[in-house]
């Protein structure tokens, strides 16, 4: 009897969706509900979905069968997708911090060639997001649900220089002090 090839690896199970979305199964747990006649078992799944171009979402689903729990989690993840601005399509624009419950996450932008240095559930989020270079550290909890929610809290704080400039009513060039052609350094500092 031939076995099907096992899916998995460091990022969990990965499937391509029809609409260019990649979903990663982060965790699956067997949970029990105690009823009069004994225990009723179900499965809880946690899934991360992303387009690898700056959009990512997560969802949890619970059902009596594993495939149904994964399907529910995937549907919820698609509905909760957020857009994260990326620098050069490979990393974040700046370092950020997020927390949820006891979970704290520090996410740092990294130079090209660094790779994804992140543990467990955070790695699945960054791979689905399309980030190639990032350093992330989880503090305070190892619970995958809280770790992912803290990671999303950090990613929601991320913004692009253009967005920051528009909030301040300036241009991105003004924000970074880029000189216009012909200006000397003294003219830039004197305003």
Swiss-Prot record:
Residues 171-182 have a biased composition (Basic and acidic residues). InterPro entries: Ribosomal_Su5_D2-typ_SF, Ribosomal_uS5, Ribosomal_uS5_bac-type, Ribosomal_uS5_C, Ribosomal_uS5_N, Ribosomal_uS5_N_CS, Ribsml_uS5_D2-typ_fold_subgr. Residues 21-84 form the S5 DRBM domain. PANTHER family: MITOCHONDRIAL RIBOSOMAL PROTEIN S5. The N-terminal domain interacts with the head of the 30S subunit; the C-terminal domain interacts with the body and contacts protein S4. The interaction surface between S4 and S5 is involved in control of translational fidelity. With S4 and S12 plays an important role in translational accuracy. Located at the back of the 30S subunit body where it stabilizes the conformation of the head with respect to the body. This is Small ribosomal subunit protein uS5.
């Amino acid at each position: 009897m031939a076995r099907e090839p096992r899916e998995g690896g460091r990022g969990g199970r990965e499937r391509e969706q029809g609409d260019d979305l990649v979903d990663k199964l982060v965790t699956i747990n067997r949970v029990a509900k105690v009823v009069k006649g004994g225990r009723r078992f179900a499965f809880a799944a946690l899934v991360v979905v992303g387009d690898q171009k700056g959009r990512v979402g997560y969802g949890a689903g619970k059902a009596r069968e594993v495939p149904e729990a994964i399907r529910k989690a995937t549907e919820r993840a698609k509905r909760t997708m957020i857009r994260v601005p990326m620098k050069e399509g490979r990393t974040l624009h700046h370092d950020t911090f997020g927390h949820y419950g006891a979970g704290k996450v520090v996410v740092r932008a990294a130079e090209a060639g660094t790779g994804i240095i992140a543990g467990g559930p955070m790695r699945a989020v960054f791979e689905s997001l399309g980030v190639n270079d990032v350093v992330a550290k989880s503090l305070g909890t190892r619970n995958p649900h809280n770790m992912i929610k803290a990671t999303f809290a950090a990613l929601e704080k991320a913004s692009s220089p253009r967005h920051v400039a528009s909030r301040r009513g300036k241009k991105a060039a003004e924000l970074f002090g880029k000189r216009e052609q012909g200006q000397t350094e003294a003219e830039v500092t004197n305003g």
